[in-house]
């Protein structure tokens, strides 16, 4: 961010409304490539950096505004350089540069908001790290789940209209509108099988994610409002406390006035759902109550989105299910809500009573069957989970073989350290350990038993460290104090970056 300010010299107190002139600045594209936005394009086109000039960008924008330029047939695509290979190259340049420019005002706004102390920021609710407290929170009062599939926008113009509330620059929005429309039209001329929206998703990922996140955040505004009004985790400053008193006062007044006419609809406003999380195109809501209450929430949200955001949510894509009968795939984890019996001892005078209460608890388990299938595909074991050797690695040295197996084992241990039950994780580590031993024994033309007896059974413990040892290396000062706390479940916030398991469907 300091690098951007050094080039742009923008004042934080002013909202940068005029972003259109920045598109013609050559250093914008140099900054975009300097942040490793899309290195695949550089590999496919070696001379890509040399073509990022003011003249090419200006010519491209001029061509986009010439409507007759796009009225070509499929046979002329080989003769027209813009419809051919250069069209993809220039469009990627504009999309990367535009996405980098549009992020500038949002970065400025985020920095200015962080400087204000004592104000609750709802942006934290939309972070991917909000999934971890969702997985560990108490589910004792929730019995119903509403699973909503987030639909794609029916038209690309909706993405531009969503961005219009954030960027007050008409020329930039017009350029984005022309770019999306004409670029998708050119794609339909070349290949009519791929829709323009899907093609934009695959070929211009950074621009798509930027527009799609704004699109999702707009319709999520109702969730943020309900969470900020009903959450008990907000800071207790004077302004927030007064706002909370006014909110509950309005609810009580509403209940007194309309209790006679609408006695069954009060719970819809008095007890909103308390859990919300979004992951991989799904919105998941947890609430307490009956199925009738969730159906009311479902109808209310669908009508609210259709009337205010032009978001068409089909009723068949919104599922209402019982919490304790539903499993959920989250970031490579298999999450299952189970009822755990809790025994409470109560004593009155000389009589003692044992009260058993079932409590819903979310167990994050390691998906052992998909992992064994992946290991079998990678030739670490067979389909039954029995470890086998890897003949491909017998040409390597012993240290390289152990380092490669140990890196995979430590990565999985690091990733699945937040699982509530470690039995499946230990089985995965056993498969890797025995596969490594069989590979080394095959290299030295010996049996596994003789190889382990000759070197000892502890020769692999150095690189197969457990999650507690990883935590002790990461936080050496506090590990001794919180040894018992972090022995069961440890969440590492960087697992979404170091492992592709978080992005699997």
Swiss-Prot record:
UniProt keyword list: Chloroplast, mRNA processing, Plastid, RNA-binding, tRNA processing
Top-rank taxon, per record: Eukaryota
Signal peptide: none
One family name in Pfam for this protein: MatK_N
Gene Ontology terms for molecular function: RNA binding
GO terms classed as biological process: mRNA processing; RNA splicing; tRNA processing
Compartment annotation: Plastid, Chloroplast
Keyword Plastid: yes
CC per GO annotation: chloroplast
Similarity comment: family membership: Belongs to the intron maturase 2 family. MatK subfamily.
Role, per record: Usually encoded in the trnK tRNA gene intron. Probably assists in splicing its own and other chloroplast group II introns.
Protein name per the record: Maturase K
Organism: Apocynum androsaemifolium (Spreading dogbane)
